[in-house]
Amino acid sequence: MPPAGYLLGESQTKEPSEKRCYAFFDGQNLYHSARKVFGCAWPNYDPVLLANRISADKGWNLIKVLFYTGIPDQHENPFWNQFWVKKLAAMGTRGVQTYSRTVKNNREKGVDLRLGIDVVRMAITNQYDVALIFSQDQDFTEAVETVKETARLQNRWIWVASAFLYDQAYGKTAGIMGTEMIRIDKTMYDACIDPTDYRTRK
């Protein structure tokens, strides 16, 4: 049996020597995980640094970084609305493709749905060989299975990995089932912090 994440086509397809990687970030899931596991007070991670670090460690050629998040309504929560508006704008100047929508009561299903659709759509259109998903949301297992079926139908080699925050003292955490699970420890996380604080000062 192939290891988790290794998705085969109808036959034993050849592993490409250069693996095109797309990194998909579930922004809110990563933030809440950082808050619980590492005690971070705000989303201080840098998606570009994280994606580059893991891609380099794995020998993958990072092609694109995609970031998805809900944003609170500016009237209901102006603090976090402005934080995300500024952080997303900064990401855009660095080539990150961002997707956001206004959400209420922290309901992010529309955002998660878009991320899952993009993972599947970009597999079908052969845009990547590796999907690196920064999330622990098990709702994405369905998208992973669809990518697996795409690999079989198109007789292609595709790898799906999920990166998640890990601290032994916190307890058991894991990535998305059916993927290669990549741990991000505190040392790696601290090396990939965004130096800019986008919080509005009072």
Where are these regions (language model features)?
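Nuclease catalytic cores that cleave nucleic-acid phosphodiester bonds
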Residues: 93-202
